[in-house]
Amino acid sequence: MSKIKTHSTGSKRTVPFYKLPPPVPLPPLPPPDPTRYFSTEKYIALSKDEKFKFDDYDVNDETLKKVVLNEIGKCPDIWSSRSQAAIMEHYPIVATETYRRTGLLLSIKSLKQIYKCGKDNLRNRLRVAIVSKRLTPAQVEAYMWRWEFYGFIRYYRDYTQRWEADLLKDLDVVLGLEARRASKNMEKVDSGELMEPMEPMDSTMDEMCVEEEPYEETGSNWSDPAPEPSQSKSQSPEAKYPQAYLLPEADEVYNPDDFYQEEHESASNAMYRIAFSQQYGGGGSPAVQKPVTFSAQPAPAPVREAPSPVVENVSSSSFTPKPPAMINNFGEEMNQITYQAIRIAREQPERLKLLRKALFDVVLAFDQKEYADVGDLYRDLAQKNS
């Protein structure tokens, strides 16, 4: 596997791809209106007034979402700190600045809803790019620019760097397990225990691709826009993009179309993708990775530089490398959980959505807090869903 996120600039210094200038200018957003003014003190007072009604949040207003994400990006304490006091202190600033730009005065609940949906979609797409598509860092960045909201929440990747590094570590473990399975199967074939080679199992990889449960929005669309009517369905991708930046389509472990409309791109997203190859490719864009194949030889130990430090108030014990044996045992236990979940889903299909949400909520809760016991976890989940 390749290094996670650095780009050589011709000197010893490297810059993460996500911190390079955008390949093309971002779409313009409404500027602040000097005739609109709303003090944060007044906003805080209204927030405490139960009778005051804030403006409704239109889940289909994409410009509003982008403005909110853009304003949150100007308040690092919201996205780089786990201090709830610091976070809540800055939301009134985001609300009043959003009002100056859109004329809409949103509640803190609506602002947090927009922010959570943006973060969840960002992580989902990163997981698809890193784990399912197994792209290089440059290809991950090009892939992310296909999403029209990426430029307005790109800053959050400062916070996801450790998480992205952990994804790659887990991927290395899975690839090593698959290679060892293939090696053992070949040994059994050679000894006559098996009549023909068995293909590597992909179940462990599938488990790694569980999507985060987004904040539910009726009618909301955070997906890539649908294709323009003039675009021919028979047009080949090669006619639109440089060959070096065509994303792999065959032999994918995970199909992102189950969650997003990724197979189509608007003209603006195509422009982002082409411009990225021209600006960041340096005349020789990294080649698209071929689907991973395995020989009978054990996989070599992966070598990767440690991720660069990020501003994050998290105990270092959270990122202590786990012994391989412990991870292997956990993987086997997850196989059993997956089997039982699928069995229940088949027996009770009408409760599939509820089952999926429950599983996501439990797993993703550990991204938000370091739990000492199961009781705390269940209390938080009960409060969240009450």
UniProtKB/Swiss-Prot annotation:
InterPro entries: LIN-8 (IPR005020)
Pfam families: Lin-8
One GO CC annotation: nucleus
Spans annotated as Sufficient for interaction with lin-35: 175-285
Residue pairs linked by disulfide bridges in the UniProt entry: none
Family, per entry: Belongs to the lin-8 family.
Protein name (Swiss-Prot/TrEMBL): Protein lin-8
Species annotation: Caenorhabditis elegans
Gene name as annotated: lin-8
